[in-house]
Amino acid sequence: MKPVLIHTHFHKRKTGVTRSIENVLPFFTDDFETYVYGSNIDGNKITTSKLKSLLFSDRKTVVHCHRNNEIIRMLCYRFLGGKFTLIATRHAETIPSGLTKFLLNKADKVITLIKSMSNNLGIENTIVGHGVRVGEFVPNSEKKLEKISQENIILNAGRVRKEKGQLVLLEATKILKEHENWALVIVGQVDKPPFLEELKAIAKKYEIESQVYFINETRAIISYYQVAKIVIAPSFSEGFSLVTAEAMSCECSVIATKSVGVHSELITHDKNGYLFEAGNVLELETLLSKSIKNEIPLVGKEAREEIIKNWSAKKEAENLIKVYKS
């Protein structure tokens, strides 16, 4: 009988964490009887009664949590006599709060995503970076977007908020006024409506509002990667940056902030992407301008090669299985 693996997901919406869990689930089934427990996630869902029956049985069970509320629930079951291995992944690059550190110390094993996160945590951990479904996130030069008249697309995907660097992005894309067949498409959930209005005001100031599009968060993000020639990730902070890896898998030429999240591990500057200092408008503007004018090459093919070789969801799952079985 296979051991049991349960990934928990207690969140009101689908997020990058959700996608990272969904990416690896198919690769566990040869080794584990695999379930997800919670809501707003795709997978083989388990009921609370079935969960309890497993946790309080003699079946070898691994529970992998991703948020504090999930760890707390599992620790309650353990206090009541549940027998299982508790794995916790830290998804944020910031220094953990006292509560978070306390909860992580209660886990049997802790996973981090990138080197800086591992070094700053202060708790023994294993680094397992996220992976991409490389068979699904593929280039498609035939893909088109309705309602966008420009032929060439620059994409920014993810949450729309100050930490994600869209102010820097809008300032840098003022050069679009000189390139009427290029558009900036920003796809993601807006945290605060006034911030969106601030971005629109910048576009209006530079007279590029007809070349800047704001699209609500969508699960159909692959289509946007496939039409984009360039993807810009201008974040000041990232836990990982799955968007960047997904874009690279779709053969987008990526311009991303240096030493933020996994950017500097994914990207070798000038080889499979481009890096700039977070907040440096001029540096981003220069890289973008040179890319548009073909003064530096678009390196999407090299980007995909890097993801296939080192950052696939299958490879992530293999590394997680090593942790589960250790």
Q: What residue spans do the PLM features occupy?
A:
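A conserved mid-protein helix/loop that constitutes part of the nucleotide-sugar donor-binding site
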Residues: 16-23, 152, 161-180, 184, ...
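Short His-centered aromatic/hydrophobic patch
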Residues: 65-70, 90-91
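Conserved acidic donor-binding segment of nucleotide-sugar-dependent glycosyltransferases
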Residues: 268-270, 274-281, 289-295
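Glycosyltransferase donor-sugar binding loop
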Residues: 38-41, 157, 183-197
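Aromatic "clamp/platform" in nucleotide-sugar-dependent glycosyltransferases that forms part
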Residues: 217, 236
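A charged, aromatic-enriched C-terminal amphipathic alpha-helix characteristic of glycosyltransferases
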Residues: 297-325
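Acidic anion/phosphate-binding donor-loop and adjacent secondary structure
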Residues: 98-99, 119, 132-147
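Short hydrophobic beta-strand element within catalytic cores of glycosyltransferases
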Residues: 253-257
